[in-house]
Amino acid sequence: MNLEALPKYYSPKSPKLSDDAPATGTGCLTITDVMAAQGMVQSKAPLGLALFLAKVGVQDPQFAIEGLLNYAMALDNPTLNKLSEEIRLQIIPYLVSFAFADYSRSAASKARCEHCSGTGFYNVLREVVKHYRRGESVIKEEWVKELCQHCHGKGEASTACRGCKGKGIVLDEKRTRFHGVPVYKICGRCNGNRFSRLPTTLARRHVQKLVPDLTDYQWYKGYADVIGKLVTKCWQEEAYAEAQLRKVTR
C-alpha cells in the first residue's frame, strides 16, 4: 500500500473501503486495517507521515512545520550561526515555512497570485474622460482598478507548468514533422516535474529586509542551502514513511 492511497480513507464515497480491486478473497484491507497500519507508521515515522498528510490537506501542517523547525535549528550552518539570536529566530521559521510550501506544491495545487498579491485586481494609471454639466469633457489621469489577467480575478493561480499544462511532456514539433506522427518529449521548462517550484528570490527578499548587507555568497551558501536541505529532508521523511507503510501492509 502506498501513501497516496491514504487520503481516500478520510473521505469515503462508498461503503466499499478497500485498497485492492474487488475480489472474492479475504486478502483486501479494510478501513480498520488501514487505520491500524497508519498508527504503526506514525510511531516509527511521525514526521514523514505528518508531512504527507499536511501536504494533501488531511492534517493541520503545524506539527509537520514544528518537526522541520527542530531540524533546522539543529543544522550547523556558519552563516546562520553568525546572526544574532533575535534575527535568527525570525529567519529560520520563515525558511521552514518556505521549504514546506515548496515541498507541498504539485500540478494540482494553487498558490496566491504574485501579480495582484491575491486581491484579483491591481491599480493602474489610466486616462479617464470626465464629463461635466456644461457639456465639456476633460481627460484626466486617475488610478483605477483592473482585473488581473493572470488569475482572472480569482486571487490564486495554478502551480502547474505553463509549458506542458501539468503533463510533464510537450509535443516535439521538429520530430513530429519529420516522422509524420505525434512525438513527445520531456518539458524543458519544468524538466518533467509538471509544476513550477517556488523561486528562491521570494525568500531572499524577505531575508534581505532583516539582513540588509546580504551578499550573494551568504545567500547561496547559507540561506538557500538551508532551504534545499529542508526540502530534501521532507522528501526523505516521506519516502521513509512510505517504506514503513509498505512494510506493515505487505
From Swiss-Prot:
Source species, domain of life: Bacteria
InterPro entries in alphabetical order: Antitermination_sf, Antitermntn, HSP_DnaJ_Cys-rich_dom_sf
UniProt key word Transcription: yes
Keyword annotations: DNA-binding, Transcription, Transcription antitermination, Transcription regulation
Presence of the UniProt keyword Transcription regulation in the record: yes
GO biological processes: transcription antitermination
Molecular function terms, GO-annotated: DNA binding
Position of the signal peptide: none
Family: Belongs to the phage antitermination Q type 2 family.
Function: Positively regulate expression of some phage genes. Bacterial host RNA polymerase modified by antitermination proteins transcribes through termination sites that otherwise prevent expression of the regulated genes.
Name under which the protein is recorded: Prophage antitermination protein Q homolog QuuQ
Lineage, top ranks: Bacteria, Pseudomonadati, Pseudomonadota, Gammaproteobacteria, Enterobacterales
